[in-house]
């Protein structure tokens, strides 16, 4: 019972870790270091493997991510004695879209896998940085060693790992015909977030999906200070920031990917001399 109370329930007795505290920064440092080393090592070693072999790594990352997400949801439901907390855990945040995008990139077929791979490459690092480093709400409430803080860290870092691995292994394609689809995926989840926030606003479980109602210590805090929480200008600014990231990061990823492909297919000048 002690283990359950301290590490899984909301009736813990430990002190909150604190946002950007030593414990928070230590967890971030270890998580980012491990994810980066793994992504670089596996990405370089599998760069010239088949697409199927490259996607095997994404499958492990997807299972890892979903395991901890499911564990946290299960703990919340058991603690509440009700499945109602699941309403707060739908994948309608920019970072938790990865709970859908990463498995589809890993296990999907043909164009679905290709488009979702591009999506993860664009948004994975943003999820890792903004979601784990900017998780003020989580670390202000829960101890460093709690399912909520650990799930937040591990699932976000897994997204960053997946994005780095995709870049390094040259798994993404960034085809022009897929651009409208990646934009459509983001737009669809935004619509779902707005609908969910509106439908659950007057219930005991009001949601703040996509942080459209208020910030959570993420970079959107600047918009909240400028326009105020629950305002239309705040919500629009938050949405525009996501679209801006999609445009800038997508263009950069596409350029780097095409440059890498060109370098691989260009003949060596030394061979030409021979």
Where are the language model's segments positioned?
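N-terminal topogenic module of multi-pass integral membrane proteins
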Residues: 1-56
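Alpha-helical transmembrane segments in multipass membrane proteins, preferentially the mid-helix core
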Residues: 37-42, 101-105, 158-177
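Hydrophobic core of alpha-helical transmembrane segments in multi-pass integral membrane proteins
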Residues: 27-45, 64-71, 187-194, 239-251
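Membrane-proximal helix-loop-helix units in multi-pass membrane proteins
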Residues: 104-162
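Structural signature of hydrophobic alpha-helical transmembrane segments
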Residues: 27-31, 83-96, 120-122
């Amino acid at each position: 019972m002690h283990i359950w109370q301290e590490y899984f329930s909301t009736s813990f007795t430990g002190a909150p870790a604190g946002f950007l505290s030593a414990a928070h920064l230590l967890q971030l440092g270890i998580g980012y270091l491990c994810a980066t080393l793994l992504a670089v090592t596996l990405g370089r070693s599998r760069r010239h493997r088949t697409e199927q072999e490259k996607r095997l790594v994404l499958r492990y990352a997807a299972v890892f991510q979903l395991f901890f997400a499911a564990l946290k949801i299960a703990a919340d439901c058991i603690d509440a004695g009700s499945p109602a907390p699941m309403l707060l855990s739908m994948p309608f945040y920019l970072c938790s879209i990865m709970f859908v995008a990463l498995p589809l990139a890993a296990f999907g077929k043909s164009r679905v896998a290709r488009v979702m791979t591009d999506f993860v490459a664009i948004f994975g690092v943003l999820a890792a940085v903004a979601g784990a480093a900017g998780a003020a709400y989580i670390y202000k409430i829960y101890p460093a060693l709690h399912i909520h803080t650990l799930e937040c860290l591990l699932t976000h870092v897994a997204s960053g790992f997946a994005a780095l691995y995709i870049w390094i292994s040259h798994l993404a394609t960034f085809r022009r015909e897929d651009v409208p689809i990646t934009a459509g995926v983001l737009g669809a989840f935004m619509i779902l977030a707005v609908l969910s926030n509106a439908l659950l606003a007057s219930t005991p479980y009001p949601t703040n999906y996509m942080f459209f109602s208020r910030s959570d210590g993420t970079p959107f805090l600047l918009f909240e200070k400028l326009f105020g929480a629950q305002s239309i200008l705040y919500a629009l600014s938050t949405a525009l920031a996501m679209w801006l990231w999609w445009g800038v990061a997508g263009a950069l990823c596409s350029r780097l990917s095409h440059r890498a492909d060109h370098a691989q297919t260009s003949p060596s000048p030394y061979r030409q001399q021979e």
